[in-house]
């Protein structure tokens, strides 16, 4: 039950910024956006790899580095959802992180690290590796004072501690995630879900 509850938590967090209306939110070129949607529809098919290369080049011509990062994330997502090629997941996590670092896009840097690499380890019950990566990510985000990265670290730490049945630590990290989101005015798109998750953690302890 506990693993299924936590797995539901992981699945409830799609790529933030892609699930909403990307075209309006980021003022994406209509042709580029239409092709992005075609790529998104093929994320479970090997063809998405070639399509993502095309999307990357189209975005480069438009000078849209954000969509270039999205194109690389599409490749990562293909292997992430296949869930059986850890070397490929690690490879594309590093590709996304490297491009995001070079183009000053920390959102995608920490997305690849937390929502893909660490969540993959969590799904594989490799909680000690996930914890190592989460603590390393927290340290880097704190050094950079990147609050969204810190919030992401609290998010995955909560999931890891939950699977380890360390519910007090899971609750503490979930509360810190909420606190930093509110204090620094971070993206509140999933905040109601986060509160629900906190309630679920309290229910596991028998507390209200």
Protein language model features and the residues they cover:
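Bacterial N-terminal signal peptides
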Residues: 2-12
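Sec/Tat signal peptide C-region and signal peptidase I cleavage site
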Residues: 13-17
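A "functional boundary" signal
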Residues: 18-208
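Accessible peptide chain termini
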Residues: 1-2, 147
């Amino acid at each position: 039950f506990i693993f299924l509850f936590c797995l539901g938590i992981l699945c409830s967090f799609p790529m933030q910024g892609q699930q909403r209306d990307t075209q309006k939110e980021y003022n994406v070129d209509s042709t580029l956006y239409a092709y992005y949607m075609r790529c998104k529809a093929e994320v479970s098919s090997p063809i998405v790899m070639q399509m993502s290369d095309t999307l990357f080049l189209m975005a480069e011509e438009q000078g849209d580095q954000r969509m270039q990062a999205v194109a690389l994330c599409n490749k990562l997502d293909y292997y992430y959802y296949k869930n059986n090629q850890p070397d490929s997941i690690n490879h594309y996590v590093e590709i996304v992180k490297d491009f995001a670092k070079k183009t000053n896009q920390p959102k995608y840097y920490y997305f690849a690290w937390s929502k893909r690499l660490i969540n993959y380890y969590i799904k594989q019950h490799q909680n000690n590796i996930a914890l190592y990566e989460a603590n390393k990510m927290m340290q880097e985000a704190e050094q950079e004072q990147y609050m969204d990265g810190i919030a992401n670290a609290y998010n995955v730490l909560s999931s890891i501690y939950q699977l380890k049945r360390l519910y007090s630590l899971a609750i503490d990290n979930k509360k810190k995630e909420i606190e930093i989101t509110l204090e620094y005015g971070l993206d509140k798109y999933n905040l109601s879900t986060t509160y629900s998750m906190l309630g679920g953690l309290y229910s596991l302890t028998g507390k209200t």
